[in-house]
């Protein structure tokens, strides 16, 4: 790295930022939105570590958390580093909202999506409960126009929502491959056709059931056409992401099985498998252990105490968000499930 670049910020390697971060990419990235006022990386790491320990009522853990971060054993998710221990944003990476089949719920979930994205999280949006185009509308002689116009609403919401100067909001729309609107929905990211039905700012996740896979194996023509379209789109664009709902629910934790809870959708990255419904929106509380440093930490207590760290992150989210309008579903889910990842 150009030594002058760090020095121009008044940073000394090994003192103000770690030696493993002595690259131009590190310095430019962390100084672009992650630091508050005149913070240096060391100050930011201490801020995060102390905040997590405070939320746990375990101040003695702050130095341990700081050591993990400084050593690059524990890698912080973007919202954790940017927002933990501050009065801005929330320390949560992403959320999942499930939309009920009513205009009221569609509108309320749009408000929820806007607020979640604004405060630092990507949002997975479940569309499976919505009726397909042509379905009758209650108390009306009309029929619904399907899921795509509502995707357009969420597309515009994400385009209009930013997360300060850290990153723009992001969202994915989840739909079952068996849904009646699949054929139009699978094309919404293509810049062609009716501009009012294009959703160029959304990601897509397609949900696959065991029932569909059995029909596919049995040679059902419509199932094969749909599966072929998914594969063609993935080859061309890398999307839609795929979630095998049957496999997920077979591996549900005991608490889910005991209470009859099923997973119907996922987040943008398709790695979160938590329960959602109209009144529960999942919370994705993340950080990472650095496998490149595995030989350094494999015989330490980093895994054990990193779990405590994440619990402190989740507690900060709950305490910050429980009095914020639009976060009721997420707080309810966090308090009940206490999911960490």
Predicted feature residues:
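Extended catalytic cores of very large enzyme megasubunits
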Residues: 1-341
